[in-house]
Amino acid sequence: MFRLFLFAMSGALLLAQPIKVEIFEKLNATQLLAPPSDAVPVETYQEPAFAFVRIPTKFSGNALPMDRSTPFGLRATYERILTAGEYRFRLRARGAARLEIDGKSIAEAKPQPPNTTGDDPVPPPPVREDSQLRPAQYPHQDILYRVTLPAGNHKFVLTAVIGGKGLYPTPGELSVSFAQIGQLERLLGPPTAPFLTDDEWDRYVIAVNKKHDAADIVRRRLASVAVAAEWKTRHETIRAELLKTPAPLVPALKSALPVNNDIDRFIGAKMETEAVQPTALTTDLEFLRRLSLDATGVIPTPAEIRAYLADAPKTRRAKAIERVLASSGWADHWVAYWQDVLAENPGILKPDLNNTGPFRWWIHQSFADGIPFDRFVAELLSMEGSAYQGGPAGFAQATLNDAPMAAKAEIVAQAFLGQKMGCARCHDAPFHPFKQKDLFSLAAMMQGKDLKLPKTSTVPMIEGGRKPAVVVALKPGQAIGPEWPFATLINHSESGQLPNQAEVPSRNEVAALIISPNNKRFPQVIVNRIWKRYLGVGFVEPADDWSRGKASHPELLDYLSREFVTSGYDVKHVARLIFSSHLYQRKPVADPATSTGAKGRLFTGPIRRNMTAEQLVDSLHLGTGRAYECEDMNLNPSGDRSPNQFLNLGKPARAWQMTALSNERDRPALALPIAQSIVDVMSVFGWRQSRQNAATSRDDAPSPMQTLILANGIMGTRMVRLSDDSELTELALADMPLDKMMTEMFLRVLSRPPAAEELRVMSNLLGDLYPQRRVKGAKKVDATMKSDNRVSWSNHLSAEATVIRMEEERTLRLGAKPTTRLEPRFRERLEDALWAMVNSPEFVMVP
């Protein structure tokens, strides 16, 4: 029974129920438009109005994102009391849909045909019936119907077919709006439903997406309750057994080296042996900036800085650690790391070498939900869920690869066991202890059956030619059976059972062997990865190739590995220990070269680091107060092609959501100019556009190009432009003294107040114009750039599509239109000051 809502409109009291929405699957298109009476919906939920831009994510029993049937259907039902009169109803739908009023069909939309061409004409621009009404977006059908309704209660039913063969399974801008003749249309719903205008539609879409984000979190966590309880029981058993064994002995220090926790005691013991001293402690604000970047991927906001400084000095660092560990940014920042390590490589164009599905969304939800890391590995290796909507099944893909599971075996061994097997792909590895058979036997376990060695994965043998310098033991076409190749780490017989069983039993075996409590290597590798991420260098280097390195602090590695396991494989627990240590809180070591080699890694302080590409881009947006403006990561906006051809990765809100733009052929119509300006910066700072292979470390050494692109590039220029969509424009217009405004700007960008000399320089630069900085009568204008969604792969060969994209790029190069609300000379000087702050080494370096 739905709760009744009361609304007052035109002096009359009207009753309205919420919109009930049902999702149906495994029916044909005809049945989906008129579901049989015995059809049972797989999902029932509510929406605030008749605009359906997003469908709830479908989750499996262990909370993996799943695909819905092809096609699936939506039915929305609503009742409302209306006054008598003539009404205009408008149905907008990309595909087949039907609107009924009181049991009578009044409007029907036709099915959307799939598209296979690339030389369609560009459709005409949307037509506005008047200056306010939002036009229908291509390829939506816009169907109008006039009807005279008597006063009283009326029932509205919308049914729609979503997706289908060759189509993308999203609803587009499916909506119903209405109004009495002569009035502006609102979305069908309560009297307070949004008007069908651009501004109100945009606000509605943002609100609905937030609502679905929150609902998806609740639903997937509820779906995961039973499985989570089984994992908890497993962890309690492992913990009880491990606590029966002696813990590593924590050394006692002879000197007065600073100590916050046991990490400092282990580190200090070696420092005493080598007679070296630690670096000094960071200031409170240096620590907060480093902590925020390392834990959440962005610099702290002024509000966070003030909350931090409001805490008592003795407890503020500990409280800050707990705040960042509880932040939503924790999940965002880990995604980018595992995208590299697991070679997540989705493409928004047609498949290229080693493209995967976008399992980034599952990585994010795993860290957001705080699932234990051993469960993370098990779910990854199950390779189940949706391949194109964000599930681990996307990891199984390696397009255009002759042996996809061999590629995945390389990644898994390297990521979780520190075993680099890449050289064993085509022959026995000459410098690693692996044979080609080892790699393919692990691949066969992940495949769930024997694998035949592809001819293209062998070294060609030319009759009478020179004998290869490598050993080629396998022949093309030879079958290799499933077999565990790492008996030196753990015997196959020790695999055990896991709470959630994969559909392919041998994949379950691989996961069980990797995360077994008897496999000491797994927790050591993960702890080493976490340590390297926060301190700049690992106990073992390279972190992904343990056959080449020895641990610099084996006892501390064992100690942290034990902590990791007894905590229930909780990454946050290890992070908390590291963040709380005096070592992490020290000033960085100036010269990384002094810390190379196991003997030289004394950890007198963290290694000096620059921001990662993702940290830089996200912090630039946050620090300069700009929204993440970018096109959708989608070259199929009309939705008339299937996900296995063209992915829709949505509109990015963080840098990890970017992807390769796949326009190597330099077709201007396929360009996404704003996204390209962001990708250009990220690439120069070490981000990999194409992750065809796994990587733990990036090629991100400082270079002149980094300085040049930040100082002169499109994105850097756009960030410092004071336009009407910049928060810093509002700051400059606020009623406050100049020194307070500059303090706020320094806090935003550099996470500290300005020094006295900096304030003097800023006062000399801006002081004479500051009192007259506001322009009377100037109005705020919409400065956001918008992409023309008429351009897609389907028409990218047309000259008009090229002209549209080239004009968008030209506009982008000109930059956002400066605000007219600030006096031009003052605005330009303030932009110069902001440019200097953003381009200072202090901004890019992690304290």
Residue ranges of predicted features:
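Sec-dependent signal peptide recognition
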Residues: 1-8
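Boundary at the C-terminal end of the N-terminal hydrophobic targeting segment
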Residues: 8, 14-16
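Acidic/polar, compositionally biased interaction segments
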Residues: 17-210
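N-terminal pre-domain segments of enzymes
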Residues: 195-258
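Short, structured secondary-structure elements
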Residues: 237-487, 508, 519-561, 571, ...
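Glycine- and hydrophobic-rich flexible loops that cap the catalytic core of alpha/beta enzyme folds
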Residues: 503
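Extended, well-ordered alpha-helical scaffold/bundle regions in very large, multi-domain proteins
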Residues: 753-759
